[in-house]
Amino acid sequence: HRLLYITNNINIPEVIRSKYALLVETEIPEGYGAYFSFNEKNLNVNNFYHLKSAFNYLLEGDIVRVDDRGNFATLFRVNSTNNTILLTTRCNHYCLMCSQPPTTEDDSWIFSETMNLLEMIPDTTKVMGYSGGEPTLYGDDFVRLIKKTKDYLPNTVIDVLTNGRAFSDYSFSKKIEKANHPNCTFGIPLYSYDPVNHDYIVQARGAFDETIKGIVNLKKCNQRVEIRIVIHKQTINDLIETCSYIARNLLFVDHVALMGLEITGFTRANL
């Protein structure tokens, strides 16, 4: 895989052209890392990628991944406030309504790619997110990621979507504190005040206790925490009691959000 900036500029100095994917329709200057076009006729050049109309949002400075088999994907959009990086599809939950069903495959290449991507993202980016799967399955590498995010994007608001269980290990929470990102929020789902129901929804025994302990440890380590309650048929009956539980026992969290469902993945069976 290669990561490239999108550009419309045909006059970029040749010495750095290999870092760019040129959006081109007619003239094809040499030396660019890839050539993107909505015109299928431009096939007489190496590293050519024909774009469907759905990609007409691509702008100068967007970042894409390309490979030698003709595949490409958009990783970062300069004008978007919803840039979220999927770090892994692996997870230690199997939530009944998961919109991103977990896999067991080794996708650690995504982590390596993300570490490189951080060096390309503009430091003027206002907000960005990390999600999964479960990002903290990377362990100490996840801490490295937060440190590097601070180094390259110190003014960017970072939202991390996690089940929070890894933070039940206080030493891991302390490592996150030492990474010292100035504006990082951990969004952690709590599906029920009832441990049995929460564990059933996430299909993991003992998850409730680890999640609560993780929330407490993060706050002990001066981290921002948002509790998320996804509303569906397995959580709606407990909603008032769950909110009361949070108000009584977790009043120190920074934010509580009631979330709607994404109608993908396992969701259709558990509306």
Residue ranges and their predicted role:
Residues 1-81:
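Flexible, acidic/Gly-rich N-terminal and inter-domain linker regions that tether
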Residues 76-111:
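Canonical Radical SAM [4Fe-4S] cluster-binding loop centered on the CxxxCxxC motif
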Residues 91, 186-190:
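Conserved phosphate-donor/acceptor-positioning beta-strand/loop module used by diverse small-molecule
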Residues 102-116, 135-179, 190-195, 204-210, ...:
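Canonical radical SAM enzyme core domain
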Residues 117-137:
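Short Fe-S-cluster ligation motifs
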Residues 121-125, 153, 179-180, 222, ...:
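A structural signal for short coil/turn segments at secondary-structure junctions
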Residues 128, 183-186, 209-270:
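Conserved C-terminal portion of the radical SAM core fold
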Residues 194-201, 264-270:
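A short acidic, helix-capping loop that chelates divalent metal ions and anchors anionic groups
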